């Protein structure tokens, strides 16, 4: 799997050319292009605009890349009329157009895609014949995560806590471990420079772990 962000700068062009060549050098059932695109609303109304999607499609086509699947991102519900419009102007079947819906947990996104038939369409396009799983372990995991009731407060100490993305993998690991144990995490960010011998006990009050203070 290769992810490439479509931008109008020279840095991304070699990657786009590389995936074009990958498609050209392999059988059609071995390569699949998925285009993720924003479907914005008109300010002051809920009207969805498909022009940005049509424009990005034409940009890709000009580079020799034809998307097989469209994943649409919008805060509003993508109606069948919108899908048909994109299908018409972007030359892709309606069943190849799905919405990335707003969900409570990011782990619900695959379930949302399954409900919309994305998994079956991918199997069809790649000519794969895979057996249905006997047990839906992913759905069971999401149900377990969402049913977590107990709360645990964890402090994450770092030098760059103002930029939460700098510790995103650590934060996600803590949340995943807590979910699996039946807990929800109240994550607090602690700036390491503010921790001194005089302030450490005060700063670390209220956390779930035992303290030596």
Task: List each model region and its residues.
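N-terminal beta1-alpha1 cap of cysteine-dependent amidohydrolase-like domains
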Residues: 1-213
């Amino acid at each position: 799997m290769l992810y490439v962000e479509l931008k109008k700068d020279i840095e991304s062009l070699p990657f786009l050319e590389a995936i074009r060549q990958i498609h050209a050098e392999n059988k059609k059932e071995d390569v699949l292009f998925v285009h993720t695109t924003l479907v914005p609303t008109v300010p002051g109304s809920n009207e969805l605009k498909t022009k940005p999607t049509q424009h990005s499609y034409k940009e890709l086509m000009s580079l020799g890349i034809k998307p097989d699947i469209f994943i649409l991102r919008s805060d509003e519900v993508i109606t069948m009329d919108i899908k048909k419009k994109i299908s018409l102007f972007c030359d892709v079947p309606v069943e190849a157009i799905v919405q990335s819906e707003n969900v409570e947990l990011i782990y619900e996104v695959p379930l949302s895609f399954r409900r919309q038939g994305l998994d079956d369409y991918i199997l069809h396009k790649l000519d794969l014949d895979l057996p249905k799983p006997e047990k839906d372990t992913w759905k069971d995991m999401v149900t377990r995560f969402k049913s977590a009731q107990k709360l645990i407060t964890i402090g994450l100490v770092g030098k760059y806590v103002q930029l939460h993305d700098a510790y995103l993998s650590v934060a996600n690991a803590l949340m995943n471990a807590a979910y699996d144990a039946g807990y929800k995490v109240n994550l607090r960010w602690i700036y390491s420079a503010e921790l001194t011998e005089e302030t450490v006990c005060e700063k670390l009050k209220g956390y779930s772990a035992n303290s030596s203070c």
